[in-house]
Amino acid sequence: VILGGILSDKWVQKNIKGRVYTSAIGLGLTIPALLLLGFGSSMFNVVGAALCFGIGYGMFDANNMPILCQFVSSKYRATAYGVLNMTGVGCGALVTSLLGKYSDSGTLGDGFALMAGIVLVALLVQISFLRPKVNDFVDE
């Protein structure tokens, strides 16, 4: 998380999309983590997955609120962050149910691969559509 915050703070000084890019790098690191968890069979795979996921998710999560601040006025940030968190919790609940079904059918690796694909789509959407104009959005 600290690495993601520091990198993002420095990068946004040179490029207004620096926070988006830092978050995207972090999100990208979760893809191999999910694949290693789904298909790996050694301690090396588990440790690699843990490192990729820990660093990646930390970089991603450290930038959610700062990115939100680039698009949402301070008047609505608490609401926007609440919606963001609610969506995350809802998706987490769906993933738990989905992975349980994959596990019951003996194809848990396929479930993790599906999640990696969904993360890839989210990554592409993030890079393509998040185009901040300012570092701190203010209503005029």
Give the label of every model feature segment.
Residues 1, 71-105:
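A late C-terminal transmembrane helix in Major Facilitator Superfamily
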Residues 7-8, 12, 99-107:
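Interfacial helix-cap and linker-helix signal at transmembrane-aqueous boundaries
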Residues 10-26:
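Cytoplasmic membrane-interface "Motif A"-like loop-to-helix N-cap segments
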Residues 18-21, 101-118:
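A membrane-interface helix-boundary motif in multi-pass transporters
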Residues 29, 52, 84-91, 121:
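Small/hydrophobic positions within alpha-helical transmembrane segments
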Residues 31-39, 115-140:
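Multi-pass alpha-helical transporter architecture, strongest
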Residues 43-59:
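Hydrophobic core of transmembrane alpha-helices in multi-pass small-molecule transporters
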Residues 59-72:
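Intracellular juxtamembrane helix-capping segments at the cytosolic ends
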